[in-house]
């Protein structure tokens, strides 16, 4: 899971 990319 990626956040703020």
From Swiss-Prot:
Keywords: Amidation, Amphibian defense peptide, Secreted. Disulfide bonds: none annotated. It comes from Litoria rubella (Desert tree frog). The modification Threonine amide is found at residue 5. It is found in: Secreted. It comes from the Eukaryota. Expressed by the skin dorsal glands. GO terms for biological process: defense response. The keyword Zinc does not apply. Shows neither neuropeptide activity nor antibiotic activity. Its main location: secreted. One of its GO terms (cellular component) is extracellular region. This is Rubellidin-3.1.
